[in-house]
Every structure is written in C-alpha cells, then in structure tokens.
C-alpha cells in the first residue's frame, strides 16, 4: 500500500528519461567554443563584468532565435540556408578582422561602468551577429544534433523542451561564473600592471580571431547569384487568358484538390556521385548512386512512426497542402474545395456504416455468410470479357518484376476454339510489330541532341559518309603513301574507282592514330568540315545565344530538369552504354583530365564500337561543375590522406588528416618498470639521432616522387610501339592464363597433399575460395578497365594491361581472427620498442592494394609500369614456426631427460632394496595381481591393467552405482558423506554402472583411477582423497630437487647404472607378457560395440520388412488401421498451437494413483512404463537405484511390467500443488469448466470415439485417455507391438554372452542423465505452454474466447482429403469409406470430422512405425526408410505420337504467355492435377473431337468430376475464386535494384516468410491430391450452413472497401461516440447467445469488430487508398502518399 502511495507522488514522475536527456543536450549547446564565446571572454577581460554580461546577453538572444527557428520556418530558412547570408557573412568577417588587427587607443582598454557607454551597443551587436552566423562560420555539431532530435523525436514533448531550456540556462550561468572567475584570477595573479596586461590580451585575441577567420573563410558557401542549372529557363508572369496555350499548366489547373499540390518529378538533390580518382586503393568497378528515398515522420494507426521510404517531393507536397489549409480564412475557394472533399468522404463513411449494419442484420435472420459478403466489381468489355487489372507490386508484396511462370494455366486455354486461336495470334503479331516501331524517350532525347549538335557544329556520326571535298583532301594528303598500308590503299581505291562509293567516318577512325589526326588537322585548318577531335571543348560546348534565344517566348516549368534526372535514373544502363553518350558533351559531369575521345571497334564485330578516352597530365579546370548542391558538400568533407597531395590552399589545412601514433595497452604493460623506461628513453634518443641523419627534406622527397613518375612515363612511352605491343600483349595473355589455370591450381593441390601427409587438416575449400575470388580484367594501355572476358579492340597495335583484382597469395596455413590476435600479442611482447615504432611507421606508409597489374615476366605492380611488388616467401612462416618450436620445446626436453637420468642414479644409490622388490613384479602380474601405482593415473590405464579378473566373472544381480554430487555418495540406497566412504571405495575392486535409458555398462576399475564423463556423477580430487595420489616417477622427479647437491662415488654410479639397465629389461618383459591381454581387451571392447550396432540395424530392417507388407493386407477393411495408429503414436507429441499437453486437465482417478518416484527438482512424477521406455537398452537389472544431485529415480525391470503399454501420467504432489494454485487463476479455471475439458475427457470410451474425435481434435491428451477410448482393434495391434519388443529384447539378451556383460557398449545409450534431463525439461515446457495457451489463447482481434472452436470448424472444408490421404488405400477404398460415413446415421451430423491431419502425417513416423506382423516381399526399394506406401503419383502415360504434338502446343503457349494481358495463376496445392488437366485440353484441341472425352480421361487418369465444374456455372465461378489468383504485369517507374534500402532490408523481412511458405508447400503437396478437386463441388454446397460466428465482421466488406473505411474513419473527429454501434453489436451478441447450433459447443458468440486498424507494415494499403480516396492514379504518386496518407488529427 505504501508503495502505491509512493508511486502516486508527482516527484518520481518528473524524473523522466526525457528530462535527463533534454537537460544533457541543453547543457551541451553551450560547451563548444566558437567566435561568439571567444568574444564574450574577451569582453570580460578587457571591459569588466558589465561588458561581459552585455556580450553574453547578445549571444543568448541569438541562440534563442536559432532555437525558435525550429518552429518558425521563415527564421529557419533565413538562418540555416547559407546562400542567403553569404553576402553578409564574408565581408563582415573580413572587416572585423581588419579592425581588431591593430591596437587603436587606450580607450578600448578602459572598463565599461555604465549602460550609456558607446561600446555597449557595439559589444552586443558583435556577439549577436557572430552567434547568428555561427552555423555558417563555425558549424556547431552538438547544436545540429539537438536540432535533429527536435525534428525527428521530441518536437512535441513538453518535458523535453522544458528540461532542454533548463540545461541551456545552466550552461549559460556556468559560462558566466567561470568567465568572472577567470577575470578575478588574471587580475590577482598578474605579475605586471593589469592595464599593461590588457594590451597583450588584446593582441592574443586578435590573433585567435584572425586565425579562425582565415581557417573558415575557405569553407564559405557558394554566392547567392550562382546559377546551377545552365539550361533552366526563367519564370515570368502572364495573364489568365494565356494559360490555355500551355497544356501542362492547364492540366494542372483542373487537378483534384489534394493532388494539385503534388509534383512527383521534382528532386531536391542529385542522384549520382562519381569518383574523380582513377587509381585508388578502394577503387570499384561500378558507378555509385545515392538513394532517392529519405526518412520522414508519418501517422499510421494513430501513432507517429519514422518511415524510410519518403521521397524528397513529399515534403513539398505536405508543405503546400497544409499552407492551403492554413489560408482557408483568406481564400473562400480553397476552403470550399476542402470542405466539399471532406463532406463527400463523410457521406461515404455513413453509407459504408449503413451497408455493414444491413449485412449484420442479414446474418441475424439466418442468411449464409457467403451470400452476405460483398462481391468484387469488375469492368466488363465486349462479349462479357473482363478487363484485366493492372499488376500492383505493393499489393502482392512483391518489389520486382515477376517473370511469367511456365506452369500456370491461361484462362484462354479453357474455352477457345481453333479459329479464335488464329485470330488471337494475328492480333499479337500486330501488337509486336507496333512495339518494335516505338523508340524509348531517352533515345529520342539523345538523337535530338545529336541532330542539334550536327546542325550547329557538324559533328559527324561514324556511319555517315565523307563529303566530296573531304574525299579530295584525303586523296591529296595520302596519294604518295607506301603500298604496305592496306587501310589507306583501300580508301584510296574507293575514291579513285567511282565517286558513288561512300567512305564513312568509321573507316577514317580505323586508321592509325597519326594518320587520322593528320587528316582531321587539315580539316580543321581548311574549315571544310569542323570536327572536334583536336579540341573537344569547341566541339561539344553549346552556344548560349542559340540555346537561350527563345526563352522568353515559352514557359518552362522548374520540374523539367527533375524529369530528366528521373529518366536518367530509370535508363541508366541504356544511357551509359549508348554510343552517343560522349564525355565532354552536354552531360551531367566531365572528366578532370580528359584530353580527347576516339571511337574504336574490333575487327569482324561491327557492333562493338567503344569510346576510347585519352587523358592529359594536367587537369582541365574548364569543365562544368556537378549539378545540384554537391560543391558545398564536397567542401565540407574531410580531406583524406589519399587526397592531401592536391591541397594548394591554406583554408584546407585544418581538414587535413593527421596520423596519430598511439601506444597500445600491451606496450604499456611491457614498459612498466623503471629500468625498461630508461632503456626506452635511450632507444628513443638513438632513433631520433638516426632519423636526423637519414632525414630527407620535403623538396628532395618531391623530386624523388617526380623522378619516379617521369621514369614510369618514359618506360610507357618507349613501349608504345606497334611491334612491342604485339609481343607484349601475347606474353601478358599467356601469363594471365598460366597463372590462373595452371600455376595456382597446381600449387594449391601440392600444398594440400603435403598437409594431408603431415596429418594436418586440409585447407582446400579456403584456398579454392581465394582462387575463385581472383579476377583478371583486360584493360587498355592506359589502365582503363575494358572487360573480363573479351580483349580490347586493337590491343595488338595499341597495347594492353591485365589487372588482377584480389590477387591470390598462397599461404602454408590460414589463421582465424583469435589466432591472429594471439600472435600479435606475442609479437608485441617479444619485439622491442625500437623495432615496434619502426614497424608502426612502416605500416602507416604502406598501402594494401586490392588490385595489381601483371607484367610480362609474371610479376605484379601496383600501377602500370610501376615498381615490382615484393612477394612474401611461402616457407618463411614455416621456418619461423619451426625455429620458435625448437626454441621453446628443445631445452625443456633436454632438461627433463637430464633430470630423469639423474633421478634414476639417485634412486638406485639410496634404495638398496629396490632390486628385490622389482623382481616380484613378474610374479605379481602372472598371479593376477594389481600393478603398482605408477600406472594408476595414466589416461589409458584400462589397456595397461590386467584383465584376468574379468574374463570368467559374471555380473551380480544387484550392483550399487556410485555417483558423487555435493559431497554425498549413494551406496546401496543410503546417503553418506564422501569422507566416510573413502576407504570403502578404495578397497572396492569392481563397480558396474548400468542405466536403463541411455547409459552403457562401463568397464569396472578403481574409481580413483578414473575420470567419469557424467555431468551428474563427477568425482573430483576435492571430494575423494587417496593415500597415494601421485605416480612414482613424479615423486622421484620432485625428490631430486633436494638431493641434487649430494656427490655420488664411482662405485655407486656403476651400481646404479647396472640396476637401471636391469629394471628396464624387467619392464620390457612385463610389457610383452601383458600385450596379449591388452589386445584381447581392445578386441572385446570393439566387438561388443559392433554387436550392438548390428542388433540395432537388424531391428530397423525387421520393421522395414513389416512396412513393406502393408499393401498385401486384406482389402476388405473399410476403416484402415495404420492411419489411426499413426495418430495414436503422434498424439502425445502434437497439440494445439504447437506443443500443448492437457495432462493437467485429465480427470482420471486411476491414473493419479499410479505415480512414479518423485523428482524434487522439477516436481514431476515419471513412471517409466509408458512410451518413454521405447528407447531402453535390451539388458536390465531388477532394481538399480541411482542417486544424483539428491534426486532418486527408480527403474523397474521388464519382468514386472506386463505386455501392454502402461499408463503414463504426470501428477503433482502436495508440494507442487502449491505452485498449481499460484499459476491457475480463477478465470482460467472458469474457462476450463465452461469449455468442458474435464467432462469431455471423462466421458470418453470406445463407443463415442467419433464424438470425441470431433470435439477434441486439436487437443493433445495423454495415452491413458487414448487407451480408454481406443477401439478393440487398436489394442490388439498395440499388444502385438509390445510382444515384438519383448521378443527383440529377449533375443538380444540371448545373443550377448554373460561373460561379456561388463564390457557391453552401445552407440545409442550414451549419457542417460542428459537424456532424462532433456525429457523432463520438455515436459515442464509443455506444462508451462499449457498455462500460457489457456491464458493467451485469444488471437489478435478476438474479444471472446472462441478462437479454438473457430479453428476447429475451419478444418471442415478439407478434412475429407486429409482422411483419404492418410488411409493409405486406393480410390475404391476411399469411396467406400466416404459411403460408409455418409450412410452412418449416428455420424450424419459429423460428416466432415474436424481432424487436422496435416501435422500428424509425419513422413518419418508414418513410413517406419508399422504395427503389423512380419511379411516379406520379393522386391523392395533401395531405400525403404524413405518409401511412401500410401502416396499415389499419377504419371501421365502418353504414346510417342501424341508427345511431339503436345510439346509443340506447349511451346506455342509459352510464346503466347509472354504477351498475355492477364493470367490465372493456380495455387500451389493443385499443380499436380493442373498438369493433367492441361494435357487433357491440349489433346482435345489436337483431336478436334470431344465425343470420346470420357475414354480419354480414363487413359490419362484425369478425374471426370473436373469436367462437371466446367459445365456448372456456379461451381465454375467458385472454383476460379478459390483455386486461382488473377494477376497482370506493369512496369515500375523506379527499379528496385537502384534502391539501396530495399536491397538491405527486403531480404531480411521476407526470409522468414519464404521459409514458412516452402514448408507449407511441401506439407500440402503430400496431403492434397486429385480427390480434393473432385469433392470441391460437394464442399461448396455444404458451405451454406449457418457459420457466421466463425468469421470476423470486417470480412463482410471487400478488401477495397475495408481500406477506404479505414481511411475515412481517420478523417472523423476522435471524440465521436461509439456507444450507438457498441449497443448494436451487444444486441446481436445477446440474440446469438439464445441460439444453439448443433455443430458447435457452448459458448457461442459473434466476434466484435476490433481489426479495422490494420498493421502499419502493410504499405500497399496506402497505394489503394491513394487511388480510391485521394484521386491519385499514377504509381509514383501513391508511392509517396503511402507515408502520409492520413492527415494529423487536430485536437
């Protein structure tokens, strides 16, 4: 009670995370030191406290204005958009720096004592303006972070706002306090006069201000008058009557109200980003593109959510829409349109409510649910042909274009004649011809540009002919050329022979580079035909006079550039692969060092034209900048080390990357001592001295770099000769193929063979993966990537480079991350500080290239014609590891050998009686005695000890199993401490452990010499102590440490050597004597294991042979037994909602009395006579108590058990009964009584079997209830099963001899304790799931607890097919069984049993566990375990003369499907029957006669009931509704492969659904067959029964109406009273309570509406809402409207 009062107090509620977070971020806004803070401190130090307070007040006011800009858009646009304040910021900063640079006079150093001082206004304005300009001059990262938090998270949270304001005030107060403290300390501690010190303070702050201004001046934004779009026209005013001349504006004027504010083609930023650097360590092969989707808040299901699919134009749409709503007071027209739209939607809402109420009333009168449901409306064309729907990828949960499947059946295949097929074929041919005529819009733009270029400048295309004057000039230039130049001679022959033969520009481009440059130079000088191959800038720049001449005559909208950018994003591949996309033209970007462009092609391939781009050494800075705001972003990015060599301005020095040398934790630990620190200092001084000696000046380094570049250029220039290119190209191609396919595979094979011979794990997969990762790319001579498979054109004349991406390096072994970390730590500990520092600096200088270039001799370079990379030796790590192993292990082994020999000498010299004791060793071994303690602690002592004691010894009937846990040991059923029973355990010679579930008989030995691998019975050295726990050798080695200093005489040394040799001989003889016993023991051990495996396999084969004789069973049975037995076996493991056991709900007094031994940990009684003993081993003892962890479990022998499977019950004792009362609630108990679980389970017997099966089909009862109600035939089969098991156990006991009982071993009986623990845990989990399912059994959307009854009744429509599938019989037997059920009077109302057999038909159980007698069959399958005896596969057997025609028909339909407008996609359950039906239609068309249709159906095994569905209109419509899905195809405007977020998130979201779909598809494929479709007409007629309580009321509406209803309800005010509708539904509930349906148990109620607010992840609903309610019809618009499809309700 006190706790509740304490929680109700207001002060704990104030301590909210929002409050702490707001206070933290408010405090952080004042921490960064910028120009405004520096000026405030300067005012305190120079002008005193009043001056500082005035400066702080100006800064505080500016910060308040900046924070308020979050809620006021004009202030936000004024402050945070740099283009508007650029003109003010830069001049003001320069002026301020120039003013404060020089010291004016001493007036400024006097303190401010009054507010009337002229300096007050100046100080206030300076601090104010610098704080306002702070986001531009010095971007505050913390303030920016706070702004984003306001926007996206806490903008409406009052607690957060107040706490932020308090934190901000605290920060300002702290800043004021510390500034005053600094002033007092400077005044008090100044060694000189404070007035003189002010001069130094003034100079210091002037230097700081100037450095800030200079450093951030280079980051100033682009000026306001910058023109970013060169070809963008200017808007101008016009009259209203001129609008009719422009169709686009006129169309926009008459748009509906919400969509008139939306412009889908307007983009806020660019869509592409291209890297400038060609040779880079992280170079990629594809151009990267930024995503077009951004984050935005949305309102879904009444909650604000953050969506990642918002387009940039969404913000424009929302802004304009809300502005129009806000201006409703001023504009009557806008307010009227908005009110009209809302009133229409509210009227539609009332109509929907009335329609839903009428449908509910129809259900009350007794109408069927199928007739009451709303029907879908479709548009119909001529001859009642339905117009297909457009394919909507969002509605069907697909984001990609779906190819047409080859197994789906077209609607046209069902009823078209031959002449209709011919007509359809001609129509499709005409349609294809029209499609070929169409040209893409982007191609039109490119060709128009090209024609405009051609008319303006005369740039020819490659296939255009040369003009006559150009031909004459060509003939004049190359008339006297040598005859061996065949290309020139061919062109000259064409010009000489006849003037009609055309010479194209392509032939000119095929000439040598010098020839066509010479020809084009003459053309440029002679002004005959201007062509821009010498100066691309003149050729491709557009004249501004012509392009802007007609600007004022026409109006261009701003979204034209946006349209072009969207088209480019859509046709990126087409645009960049086109031959006319010439770099340097009017495109989006231009290369930095582009010199000229040429067109090349491969011989014999006229379509392989490629643009060859050649680059200059100096960048072309006349190129056009990127469109958009990329320049400002590029200016604010950090300049990485790879780009620092290009820095030429002091403004960028602050952004340069600086290397940070840090010392790791391991290095600190290794240099912790004082001596090591002094040594480190000495080494550092030596290193600095050497560095000064070897230091090279910066100019010298630059000269060296320049010389290396010049050297590479010289080598490339000398190699740029035709014959050299020829030989070099062939050598490079040979080296590439040799390395990839011969050298590396051979080395990998040899390495793995060597590892296998050295007994190491093979690394074939890792090496082969690295080999596959290596890619060879053919490049041009200048290093530009061309292709991976094809060689570049003219590679023998112009040269080639081969680029190796991810080069493979063979290593002796592959190390994991952990091993690498350990090796690095070892290296850090071993290597000194000097080498460590040198290595770190060397690593910083090195760049790990992901690609290299191949040389002629097979070496690799980082760049073309660069320095050869040094290859790491393969044997170097091997040599290092061998040296390391030798250094570590060899001295230790030598020392141990020396100590061992020395201890032997000492032992012999001290113990003179040793020979007499050692001679008794052989006699003790022959008499069967024990070995000495030297062998007691060996790991393989069971091989070294003598086994003569166990050869003829029989096992005792009652053996005590000893286990230790918590210092207690159980002996003979009594618990005693470990120290009391120590002596008794030591003297015990033999202990045999035998557990009946999974423990094997273990070799008897001394427990002190054994480590038991059992989690519950571990005997450690702490619990049990022995008198002699160490070996003799260890004692002797330890004793030599104290006796090493004693001298040994020569006689004693000789005697000790003699005794040592004698002892070694005796040891060798004893080993030879023990060798036969050891071999015999090993043989017996493995023989018993093989015997256990053989008996287990024999039992499995016998069960399989029984299953093979199932089909020979008598066919007279109408109710087949194996299906019921499968249900009987699997019922224990399967329950409602996955795994639910109703053991606690069984009201059976007989079962409660037969409880087993108590398990104190889990509170469960387990009697092991039930099904859980199916996996027991075949040898038992009468009574074997086992004690572990203070738990006693008792196992009974099979002699006590009867031949039947006894009851297996689980009950709770008095102690656990208390926990039951805690878990069981009164509501749960009342629900159990209302549902009637206890009564129904008590009334079950053999007579009312069908009634029980009908009522409790989804529940999982124990075997006691099953045995009470099972038929007599089941019990007979069950007794046969138990007798078979008993016979198997006795046969196995006879086969195993009693003398080998102690060494019995089985691979199936390991760790019984672990198995028992898992089984008990599963039982506890099932009981816990029981309570959870009883309390949480209501599904999402249910109000009454009727989900279980509804799920039972939903199985009515497919139970026939399930039972027919599980009966394992033919069609005759199925029909007889159905006839038997229909003729039975008692089960007339239960015609369709509610049995969900889908999960019970487990193939592994249904195929192996057969409870029949053994009958052998002559012919069996290869794998009987996977054979299905009851599944029928209908294979179509068609003769060869029909097969060829059938294939032709299938090929024809595949071609027709590609152009199909819409198709009927059959569900996956009916694909098997669909294929037969399809073949029937194809053969009917081929024969052209339908008279002999029944015979044809019989031959191809097609059910004749399918034909009835064709002629029955009602069933045909229902069949198409239930078995097919209508779909059509529509192209997307934005491809999914261009959406980065989609590629990241979509596979994760759909992975679980795909797995679930695959599992469900496999399950239904085994259960459903052709009989389901044959009984479809019967099922459809039986659905007319009154089952309205099984459905949700919102299912009465169509999906489209439901989506509209949801949207319209969001428009209503949240204060609407729903009492009227709730009262109506309650009246309906009361009326339904009075009815009593014969097929449902009580209670019976109709579910209430609770699922109108659908889940927020259904994004496709927004698309439908946008189309139907808002009037948006195009795809791009509903993509954006799905984020903000509901307006925010106004409170």
Swiss-Prot record:
Q: Which GO terms describe its biological process?
A: protein transport
List, alphabetically, the InterPro entries matched: TIC214
Q: Where in the cell is it found?
A: Plastid, Chloroplast inner membrane
Segments of this protein annotated with the region Disordered: 819-839
* Topological type in the membrane: Multi-pass membrane protein
GO CC terms of this entry? chloroplast inner membrane
May I ask which residue range the UniProt record assigns to the signal sequence?
Answer: none
Main subcellular localization, coarse class?
plastid
Question: Is Protein transport among the key words of this record?
Answer: yes
Q: Give the domain of life.
A: Eukaryota
Kindly state which keywords UniProt assigns to this record, in alphabetical order. Answer: Chloroplast, Membrane, Plastid, Plastid inner membrane, Protein transport, Transmembrane, Transmembrane helix, Transport
Q: Where are the transmembrane segments?
A: 19-39, 60-80, 84-104, 123-143, 158-178, 200-220
Q: Which Pfam families match?
A: Ycf1
Looking up PANTHER family in the UniProt record yields: PROTEIN TIC 214 (PTHR33163:SF40), PROTEIN TIC 214-RELATED (PTHR33163)
How is the subunit organization of this protein annotated in UniProt?
Part of the Tic complex.
Q: What does this protein do?
A: Involved in protein precursor import into chloroplasts. May be part of an intermediate translocation complex acting as a protein-conducting channel at the inner envelope.
Q: Which protein family is it in?
A: Belongs to the TIC214 family.
Protein's name in the database: Protein TIC 214
**From what organism does this protein derive?**
Adiantum capillus-veneris (Maidenhair fern)
Tell me the organism's taxonomic lineage: Eukaryota, Viridiplantae, Streptophyta, Embryophyta, Tracheophyta
């Amino acid at each position: 009670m006190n706790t509740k009062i304490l929680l109700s107090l207001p002060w704990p509620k104030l301590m909210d995370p929002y409050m702490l977070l707001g206070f933290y971020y408010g405090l952080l806004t004042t921490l960064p030191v910028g120009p405004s803070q520096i000026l405030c401190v300067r005012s305190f130090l120079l002008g005193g406290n009043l001056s500082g307070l005035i400066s702080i007040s100006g800064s505080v006011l500016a910060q308040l204005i900046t924070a308020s800009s979050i809620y006021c858009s004009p202030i936000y646009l004024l402050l945070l958009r740099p283009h508007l304040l650029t003109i003010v910021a830069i001049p003001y900063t320069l002026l301020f720096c120039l003013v404060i640079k020089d010291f004016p006079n001493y007036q400024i150093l006097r303190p401010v004592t009054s507010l009337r001082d002229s300096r007050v206004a100046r100080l206030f304005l300076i601090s104010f303006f610098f704080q306002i300009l702070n986001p531009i001059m010095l971007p505050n990262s913390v303030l920016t972070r706070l702004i984003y938090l306001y926007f996206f998270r806490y903008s409406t949270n009052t607690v957060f706002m107040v706490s932020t304001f308090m934190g901000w005030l605290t920060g300002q107060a702290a800043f004021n306090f510390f500034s005053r403290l600094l002033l007092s300390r400077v005044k008090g501690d100044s060694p000189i006069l404070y007035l003189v010190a002010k001069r130094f303070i003034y100079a210091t702050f002037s230097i700081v201000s100037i450095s800030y201004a200079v450093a951030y001046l280079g980051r100033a934004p682009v000026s306001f008058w910058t023109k970013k779009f060169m070809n963008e026209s200017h808007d101008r005013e016009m009259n209203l009557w001129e609008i009719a001349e422009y169709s686009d504006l006129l169309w926009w004027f008459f748009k509906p109200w919400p969509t008139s504010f939306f412009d889908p083609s307007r983009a806020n930023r660019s869509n592409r980003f291209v890297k400038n650097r060609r040779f880079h360590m992280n170079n990629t092969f594809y151009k990267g593109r930024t995503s077009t989707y951004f984050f935005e808040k949305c309102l879904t299901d009444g909650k604000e959510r953050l969506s990642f699919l918002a387009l940039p134009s969404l913000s424009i749409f929302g802004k304009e829409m809300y502005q129009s709503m806000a201006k409703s007071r001023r504009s009557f027209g806008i307010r009227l349109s908005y009110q009209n739209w809302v009133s229409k939607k509210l009227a539609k809402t009332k109509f929907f409510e009335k329609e839903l109420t009428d449908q509910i009333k129809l259900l009350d009168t007794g109408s069927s649910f199928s007739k009451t449901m709303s029907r879908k409306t479709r548009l119909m064309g001529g001859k009642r042909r339905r117009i297909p729907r457009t394919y909507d990828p969002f509605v069907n949960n697909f984001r990609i274009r779906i190819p047409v499947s080859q197994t789906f059946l077209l609607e046209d295949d069902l009823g078209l004649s031959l002449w209709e097929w011919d007509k359809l074929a001609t129509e499709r041919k005409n349609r294809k011809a029209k499609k070929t005529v169409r040209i893409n819009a982007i191609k039109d733009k490119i060709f128009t540009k090209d024609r405009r270029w051609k008319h303006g400048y005369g740039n020819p295309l490659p296939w255009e002919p040369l003009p006559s004057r150009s031909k004459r000039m060509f003939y004049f230039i190359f008339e006297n050329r040598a005859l061996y130049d065949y290309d020139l001679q061919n062109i000259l022959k064409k010009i000489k022979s006849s003037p009609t033969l055309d010479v194209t520009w392509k032939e000119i481009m095929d000439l040598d580079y010098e020839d066509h440059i010479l020809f084009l130079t003459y053309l440029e000088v002679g002004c005959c035909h201007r062509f821009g191959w010498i100066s691309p800038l003149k050729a491709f720049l557009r004249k501004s006079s012509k392009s802007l001449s007609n600007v004022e005559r026409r109006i261009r909208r701003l979204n034209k550039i946006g349209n072009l950018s969207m088209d480019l994003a859509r046709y990126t591949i087409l645009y960049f692969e086109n031959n006319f996309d010439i770099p340097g033209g009017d495109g989006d970007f231009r290369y930095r060092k582009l010199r000229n462009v040429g067109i090349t092609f491969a011989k014999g391939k006229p379509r392989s034209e490629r643009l060859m781009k050649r680059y200059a050494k100096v960048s072309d800075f006349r190129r056009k900048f990127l469109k958009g705001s990329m320049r400002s972003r590029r200016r604010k990015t950090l300049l990485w080390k790879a780009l620092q060599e290009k820095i030429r301005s002091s403004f960028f020095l602050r952004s340069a990357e600086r290397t940070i040398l840090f010392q790791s934790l391991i290095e600190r630990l290794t240099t912790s001592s004082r001596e090591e620190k002094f040594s480190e200092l000495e080494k550092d001084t030596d290193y600095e001295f050497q560095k000064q000696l070897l230091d090279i000046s910066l100019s010298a380094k630059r000269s060296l770099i320049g010389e290396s570049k010049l050297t590479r250029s010289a080598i490339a220039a000398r190699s740029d000769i035709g014959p050299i290119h020829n030989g070099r190209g062939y050598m490079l191609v040979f080296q590439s193929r040799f390395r990839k396919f011969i050298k590396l595979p051979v080395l990998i094979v040899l390495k793995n063979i060597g590892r296998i011979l050295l007994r190491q794990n093979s690394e074939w997969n890792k090496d082969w993966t690295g080999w596959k990762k290596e890619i060879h790319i053919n490049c041009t001579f200048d290093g530009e990537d061309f292709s991976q498979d094809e060689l570049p054109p003219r590679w023998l004349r112009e040269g080639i480079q081969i680029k190796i991406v991810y080069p493979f390096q063979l290593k002796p072994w592959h190390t994991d991350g952990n091993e690498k970390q350990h090796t690095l730590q070892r290296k850090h500990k071993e290597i000194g500080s000097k080498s460590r520092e040198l290595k770190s600096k060397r690593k910083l200088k090195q760049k790990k290239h992901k690609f290299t270039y191949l040389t002629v001799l097979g070496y690799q370079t980082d760049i073309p014609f660069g320095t050869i990379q040094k290859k790491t030796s393969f044997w170097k790590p091997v040599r290092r590891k061998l040296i390391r192993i030798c250094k570590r292990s060899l001295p230790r082994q030598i020392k141990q050998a020396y100590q061992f020999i020395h201890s032997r000498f000492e032992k012999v010299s001290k113990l003179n009686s040793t020979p007499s004791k050692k001679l008794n060793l052989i006699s003790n071994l022959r008499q069967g005695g024990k070995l000495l303690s030297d062998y007691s602690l060996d790991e393989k002592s069971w091989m070294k000890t003598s086994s003569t004691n166990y050869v003829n010894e029989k096992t005792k009937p009652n053996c005590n199993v000893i286990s230790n846990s918590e210092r207690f040991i159980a002996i003979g059923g009594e618990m005693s401490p470990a120290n009391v029973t120590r002596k008794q355990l030591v003297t015990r010679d033999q202990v045999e452990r035998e557990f009946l579930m999974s423990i094997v008989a273990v070799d008897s030995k001394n427990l002190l010499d054994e480590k038991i691998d059992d989690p519950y019975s571990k005997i450690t050295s702490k619990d049990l102590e022995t008198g002699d726990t160490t070996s003799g050798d260890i004692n002797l080695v330890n004793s030599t440490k104290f006796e090493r200093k004693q001298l040994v005489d020569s006689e004693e040394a000789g005697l000790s050597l003699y005794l040592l040799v004698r002892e070694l001989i005796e040891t060798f003889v004893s080993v030879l004597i023990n060798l036969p016993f050891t071999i015999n023991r090993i043989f017996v051990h493995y023989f018993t294991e093989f015997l256990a495996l053989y008996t287990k396999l024999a039992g499995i084969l016998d069960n399989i042979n029984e299953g093979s004789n199932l089909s020979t069973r008598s066919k007279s049975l109408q109710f087949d037994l194996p299906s019921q037995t499968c249900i009987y076996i699997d019922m224990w493991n399967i329950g409602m909602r996955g795994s639910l056991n109703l053991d606690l709900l069984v009201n059976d007094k007989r079962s409660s009395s037969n409880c087993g031994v108590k398990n104190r940990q889990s509170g469960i009684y387990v009697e092991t006579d039930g099904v859980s003993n199916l996996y027991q081993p075949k040898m038992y003892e009468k009574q074997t108590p086992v004690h572990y962890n203070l738990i006693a479990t008792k196992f009974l022998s099979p002699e006590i058990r009867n031949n039947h499977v006894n009851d297996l019950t689980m009950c709770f004792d008095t102690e656990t009964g208390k926990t039951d009362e805690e878990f069981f609630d009164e509501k749960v108990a009342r629900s159990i009584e209302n549902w009637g679980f206890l009564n129904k389970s008590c009334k079950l017997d053999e007579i009312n079997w069908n009634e029980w099966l009908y009522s409790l089909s989804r529940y999982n009862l124990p075997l006691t209830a099953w045995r009470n109600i099972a038929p007599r035939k089941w019990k007979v089969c069950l007794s046969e099963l138990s007798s078979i098991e008993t016979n198997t156990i006795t046969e196995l006991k006879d086969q195993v001899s009693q003398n080998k009982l102690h060494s019995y071993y089985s691979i199936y009986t390991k760790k019984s304790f672990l198995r028992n623990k898992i089984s008990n845990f599963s039982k506890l989990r099932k009981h816990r799931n029981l309570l959870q399912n009883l309390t949480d059994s209501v599904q999402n959307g249910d109000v009454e607890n009727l989900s279980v009854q509804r799920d039972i009744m939903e199985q009515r429509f497919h139970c026939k097919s399930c039972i027919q599938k599980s009966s394992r019989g033919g069609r005759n037997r199925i029909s007889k069984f159905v006839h038997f059920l229909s003729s039975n009077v008692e089960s007339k109302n239960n015609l369709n049993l509610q049995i969900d057999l889908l999960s019970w038909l487990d193939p592994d159980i249904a195929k192996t566990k057969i409870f029949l007698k053994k009958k052998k069959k002559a012919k069996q399958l290869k794998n009987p375990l996977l054979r299905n005896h009851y599944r029928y596969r209908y294979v179509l057997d068609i003769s060869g003369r029909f097969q060829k025609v059938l294939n032709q028909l299938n090929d024809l339909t595949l071609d027709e499907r590609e152009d199909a407008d819409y198709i009927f996609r059959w569900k996956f359950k009916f694909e098997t029957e669909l294929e037969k039906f399809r073949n029937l239609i194809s053969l009917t068309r081929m024969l052209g006669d339908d008279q002999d249709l029944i015979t044809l159906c019989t031959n191809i095994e097609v059910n004749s009931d399918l034909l009835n569905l064709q002629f029955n209109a009602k069933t045909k419509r229902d069949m198409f509704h239930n078995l097919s899905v209508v779909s059509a195809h529509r192209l997307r405007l934005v491809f999914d492969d261009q959406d980065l977020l989609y590629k990241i998130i979509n596979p994760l979201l759909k992975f679980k659904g795909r797995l679930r779909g695959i599992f469900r598809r496999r399950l239904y494929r085994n259960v459903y067959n052709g009989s389901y479709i044959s009984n479809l007409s019967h099922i459809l007629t039986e659905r007319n029964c009154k089952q309205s309580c099984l459905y949700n009321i919102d299912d009465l509406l169509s999906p489209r109406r439901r989506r509209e209803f949801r949207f319209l309800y969001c428009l209503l005010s949240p204060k609407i009273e729903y009492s009227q509708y709730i009262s109506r539904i309650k009246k309906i509930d009361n009326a339904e309570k009075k009815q009593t349906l014969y097929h449902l148990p009580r209670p019976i109620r109709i579910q209430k509406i609770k699922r109108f607010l659908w889940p927020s992840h259904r994004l496709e609903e927004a698309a439908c809402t946008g189309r139907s309610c808002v009037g948006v019809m195009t795809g791009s618009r509903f993509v954006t409207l799905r984020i903000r499809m509901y307006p925010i309700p106004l409170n």
